[in-house]
Amino acid sequence: MKESIQVTLEQLRETLHYHAVRYYVEDSPEIPDVEYDRLMQQLLKIEDENPELVTVDSPSQRVGGQPLDGFTQVTHEIPMLSLDNAFSDDDLDAFNKRMSDRAPTANLETFCCEPKLDGLAVSLLYVNGTLVQAATRGDGATGENITENVRTISSIPLKLQGEGWPERIEVRGEVFMPKAGFDKLNEMALKKGEKVFVNPRNAAAGSLRQLDSRITAKRPLAFYAYSVGVVQGAELSNSHYQRFLQLKAWGLPMCPETKQLSSLEDVKAYYQDIMTRRDTLAYEIDGVVIKVDDIAAQETLGFVARAPRWAIAYKFPAQEEITLLNDVEFQVGRTGAITPVAKLEPIFVGGVTVSNATLHNADEIARLGVKVGDSVIIRRAGDVIPQIVAVVQDRRPETAKDIVFPDACPVCNSAVERVEGEAVARCTGGLVCQAQRKEALKHFVSRKALDVDGLGVKVIEQLVDREMVETPADLFKLSAGVITVLDRMGPKSAQNVVSALNKAKDTTLARFLYSLGIREVGEATAMNLAQHFKTLELVQAATHEQLVEVSDIGDIVASHLTSFFSQEKNRAVVDQLIELGVNWPAIEAVADDQELPLEGKVVVLTGSLSKLGRSEAKAALQALGAKVTGSVSKKTDILFAGEAAGSKLTKAQDLGIEIRTEEDLIALIS
């Protein structure tokens, strides 16, 4: 029996040593913190039950990894130890009882609490108020000299402020990278085609341990003090919290969430509050640190081999876990975006059981190098959708399969389009795809499109949910009798909707093109298309080269147009709409030598337009040769005034400028 336990211990120690080096020395962890904690807890349990098997080189007897050879070594005068962990209120109660049993007369009623920052522990030595040395924690006894790098961190004072500081004082704290700085750093790396950091902790560690301090200087690092080590030449407060305030007065930053609390129940409430607000904080944390506030009590309680007896880290539920990627399904969003969704072996992470996670897009799949069958690290933070952040490469099975993005929409089988320079792949079946149905119909009847009065969002949603319509053409097949089955839709309201649909059949080519919901074809672009090609048939048949000749249309919009009209299903819906009576007046072609009706005219738009969108009206006027300006002057030739026109109309009247209505504008366009 003892032999099998011995083998288990040796395997655990070897595994923990390996991952400690990956985490503390190489800044390249392969497993999440929760997995390392679990292995350590297993080791401690076996060693506690079999004390004769404890060895001097066990991970339980040390704090971290050895320093790299690239930095000179610094021996800590007082060891920089780590903390024991609590994972529940029961663990916290047990911690408190251990202290009470060991020091029954000590002042254990007051606590100093702070968020447990996810960064790199450092020691700062000030002599006569000047920073002379900075070191990493290393293995707790020996760290790395990172003085030149630390000098580049703006939140760390090179000289202490105020007065009264000790002749020699060692300040300990955490160097970290705020979330905003981390996001910006990775964004810049992507633009340069460089490797991105997995998380802010890795970014902070990698930045702080650069051999070239000029690189560190460019990284958005920050620092919060959390304790004091060596002190010579002055007496400090007997309160841990008051020492924080003294350090702050000397110019050393402390975490603003640090609190002095008077009971263990207050500590538990503090933990819950910080956990609730975790995702709103500017920095990554993975728990709270709880310390006895009284320094004399700390000295009485003392230390075990690897941690103080007077402090503990109360960890949050794990936000990262390892699980299996069983499959990948592709979902189609309301705008046609196709998103790969990882189907996972269910795992409890971030307080919930997770079985699905987003993989975002094909670029993200390539960046992760993930395959079906991989063991993956899954992360869930707060309300953020769970996502895969890394692959555990050494667990990849031989049967792992590549993830292949579909060429056809998994919902409607239309072609999938991915424009060069865009990360997202999209379904091109905008008018027929069930996944996009509600948004396509809402857009089709909107005021700037066919403007169907009375056919609002809730009515559209009911029509789709009850499977009464599939495409925009189906709207014109509805009868008043059918519509009355909808909620809050009586006979009169239903008849009004039918009348509005019939009225909407009389439109313009520009509005019709806009109503189709083709990506990036807005009112102005639709108007430019209508004025350039004159007929729907020519728009549908236009090649990429012909489309880019149209004003304001580039390669991307041209690709969207050709993709849309190349789909037979989309063209079939367009044909149905025409057959059902949707029509518009013909746009007369203008001969090359014929002057445009508003050629050279300076035109101003004012007031509210009920039939045209402002950008649509502006594009139409420009197509007729006008120069559209924003203010009325003596140079203005025509003012088109909509409803509730104000000072521009008054000024135009005073100047004797020709004034026309929106109806005049529509007639001119037609």
UniProtKB/Swiss-Prot annotation:
Active site positions, chain numbering: 116
Residues bound to NAD(+): 33-37, 82-83, 114, 137, 174, 291, 315
Domain BRCT: 593-670
Keywords: DNA damage, DNA repair, DNA replication, Ligase, Magnesium, Manganese, Metal-binding, NAD, Zinc
Origin superkingdom: Bacteria
Keyword Chloroplast: no
Primary role: DNA ligase that catalyzes the formation of phosphodiester linkages between 5'-phosphoryl and 3'-hydroxyl groups in double-stranded DNA using NAD as a coenzyme and as the energy source for the reaction. It is essential for DNA replication and repair of damaged DNA.
Name used for this protein in its record: DNA ligase
Organism of provenance: Vibrio atlanticus (strain LGP32) (Vibrio splendidus (strain Mel32))
Gene: ligA
